[in-house]
A protein has these predicted regions:
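Surface-exposed, low-hydrophobicity beta-strand/loop segments enriched in small/polar/acidic residues
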Residues: 1-147
Length: 147
């Protein structure tokens, strides 16, 4: 019996990728629903992103962010909003927050969909910190063999 490299990597979860995506205060304050921030690019035709974990680090500045709505993660499946409360985005102290993925561990993965951050019809006008999204994911082929 023979195996290809991608099948072996998948078998032992060696195809899981971890990236850190920084979002500056300037970029975060320009966030709208019509101009989302791309955290992970769409993987291409015949592929889907399987988001396994997202941890948000808010490196707070001297002025807290003030999102008027909870920013949303959107893309490969339906995710939960990121709370804007005093413990996450609107904090003047550093915060490490594990985003609860509403589609995890089950959900329909959408083919060729990017992972984006949207404003959820809100605006952010103040803040001078940084956001860092630590994203753990794998790219899954959507063919019948899934490799």
């Amino acid at each position: 019996r023979s195996f290809n490299i991608s099948a072996l990597q998948s078998l032992f979860n060696e195809d899981v990728v971890n990236v850190v995506v920084p979002v500056t205060a300037t970029v975060f304050k320009t966030l709208t629903d019509s101009t989302p921030i791309t955290l992970l690019a769409a993987p291409g035709a015949g592929k889907a992103l399987d988001i396994q974990q997202i941890i948000l680090f808010v490196d707070a500045g001297s002025v807290a962010f003030n999102p008027s709505q909870d920013p949303d993660l959107a893309g490969p499946t339906t995710f939960t909003a990121i709370p804007k409360g005093s413990t996450v985005c609107a904090s003047t102290t550093d915060v490490l927050y594990k985003v609860g993925l509403s589609a995890s561990p089950v959900g329909i993965l959408v083919q060729n969909a990017a992972l984006t951050l949207t404003a959820n019809a809100g605006t952010t006008t103040t803040g001078n910190g940084m956001l860092y999204f630590n994203i753990t994911y794998k790219t899954v082929n959507t063919s019948s063999t899934m490799v």
